Amino acid sequence: MVCGMSGLTLVGNLEESARKAVQWLVNKTPIRSIRDWGIAFSLWPVHFTTACCGAEFAATSAPRFDVERMGFLPFVAPRQTNLMLIEGTLTRKMAKAAVWVYEQMPEPKFVMAMGACAIDGGIFWNSYNIVRPKDILPVEIYIPGCPPRPEAVARAILMLQKRIREGKAIGLKI
């Protein structure tokens, strides 16, 4: 089968040609921007909570900030999510669980580290048992604070959405 689409020649079996055609369409700017818009406004996080930042995130979900209006819908099962929120200190034992949860998430997937403990270990920074998320996962956004204010969390969500829409997010491998 031979077909020409503005310089793209598809030769071979139907499956291979279809895969190339889909990749060509996805790489076109209008379709990519629609796809990135859809991903940006359907961030469904799985919370990996090991410290107090998880309680502070509840304030972000409350009516005053209402992150659900930004398409931020929490889910329980990692196979239904595309954003991992690490909230708290990661020990070596929990790091294995974090990687296991991350590997279950479908593509494209993103990671945010929330709080001083998640960023660099917090008060446990020099412990032998602490693992920084950036050493085991591709962290997209860091939210500083102990715990971070709800405004900072909402701002981080907006920053991630902007990076996705611009195609600059680490998790966009497609």
Where in the sequence are the language-model features?
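Metallocofactor- and cofactor-centric catalytic cores in central/energy metabolism, strongly enriched
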Residues: 52, 86, 90-95, 99-103, ...
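Iron-sulfur (Fe-S) cluster-binding modules
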Residues: 1-79, 105-109, 127-130, 135-142, ...
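Non-catalytic alpha-helical scaffold/packing segments enriched in small hydrophobic residues
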Residues: 66-69, 80, 93, 97-100
